[in-house]
C-alpha cells in the first residue's frame, strides 16, 4: 500500500499537490472544523481565525513512516489586528512539498476578515520542481454562543505547471450547547469533488482534559482526540480513520500567550 501511494503521487502529481490536510492534531480529530476549538493553526483553514500562541504538530500520514508531515504556526494579536505565520513540510526521498504562509486579519465588532498569502513549493525527484503563490480569504462572525465562518482557499485560481490548483470552500457553524460542550457542523467543497458534510463535538471533561470527536460524510471518516491542558500548555493526541488507508495518528503541542 505504501508503494501504491508513492506511485500515485508520481503518476498523478497535480492531484497530490496542495492537499487539504489537517494542520494539527486538533483538526485531525475534528475533521478540519476549526471553530469548535481555536488554535494558531486554524488560520490555515480560515484566515479570519485568531488565537495567540505557538503550535507545533507532527504525523506520519496514514501511519506510513516514509511520509512524515510537520507543521509550525505562530499567531499574535495587536489591538484589532491578528498576525499569523505558518509552515508545513511533507517529506519523502522522492516527493517533497512545503507550504509557507503569512496571515493578516482584522476584527470589527462581531466580524473578522482575514487573508493569507501562501508560498507552495513541490518537487518530485527526476520529474519536476515548481512553486506557486496563492491567496486565501476568510470571514468570521461571532455572537455570544454562536460563531459562523466561511473560507476560500486559492481565490486567485493560481496555477502549478500551467494547471489550476484546487479551490476549497469551507463553511462552518459552531454552537455552545452547555458551558462544557460545543457542536460544529460544516460543508466543504473542493474542485472536482462532491460536497463533504462534517460534524464535530467537544466536551470539557475537566479543566485538564478535553475530548473531541467528529464524523465526515463523503468520504466516510471518523476522528477522535484528547487534549491535556496544563496552564498555558496543551498536548493533543488524535486519530482519524480512512476508508481505504491506515489510521492517521497526530500529535500537537500548543503554548498560549
Can you name each region flagged by the protein language model?
Residues 17-257:
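Subset of outer-membrane beta-barrel
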Residues 3-14:
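Sec-dependent N-terminal signal peptides
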Amino acid at each position: 500500500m505504501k508503494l501504491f501511494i508513492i506511485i500515485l503521487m508520481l503518476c498523478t502529481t497535480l492531484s497530490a499537490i496542495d492537499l487539504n490536510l489537517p494542520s494539527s492534531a486538533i483538526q485531525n480529530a475534528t475533521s478540519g472544523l476549526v471553530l469548535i476549538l481555536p488554535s494558531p493553526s486554524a488560520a490555515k483553514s480560515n484566515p479570519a481565525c485568531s488565537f495567540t500562541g505557538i503550535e507545533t504538530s507532527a504525523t506520519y500520514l496514514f501511519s506510513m513512516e516514509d511520509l512524515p508531515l510537520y507543521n509550525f504556526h505562530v499567531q499574535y494579536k495587536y489591538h484589532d489586528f491578528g498576525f499569523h505565520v505558518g509552515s508545513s513540510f511533507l517529506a519523502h526521498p522522492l516527493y517533497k512539498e512545503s507550504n509557507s504562509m503569512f496571515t493578516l486579519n482584522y476584527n470589527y465588532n462581531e466580524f473578522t476578515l482575514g487573508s493569507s498569502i501562501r508560498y507552495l513549493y513541490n518537487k518530485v525527484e527526476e520529474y519536476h520542481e515548481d512553486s506557486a503563490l496563492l491567496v486565501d480569504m476568510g470571514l468570521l462572525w461571532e455572537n455570544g454562543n454562536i460563531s459562523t465562518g466561511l473560507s476560500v482557499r486559492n481565490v486567485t485560481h493560481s496555477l502549478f505547471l500551467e494547471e489550476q490548483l484546487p479551490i476549497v470552500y469551507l463553511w462552518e457553524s459552531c454552537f455552545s450547547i452547555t458551558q462544557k460542550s460545543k457542536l460544529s457542523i460544516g460543508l466543504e467543497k473542493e474542485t472536482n469533488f462532491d460536497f463533504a458534510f462534517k460534524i464535530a463535538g467537544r466536551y470539557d471533561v475537566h479543566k485538564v482534559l478535553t475530548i473531541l470527536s467528529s464524523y465526515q460524510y463523503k468520504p466516510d471518516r471518523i476522528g477522535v482526540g484528547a487534549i491535556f491542558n496544563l496552564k498555558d500548555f496543551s498536548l493533543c493526541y488524535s486519530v482519524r480513520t480512512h476508508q481505504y488507508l491506515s489510521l492517521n495518528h497526530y500529535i500537537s503541542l500548543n503554548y498560549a500567550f
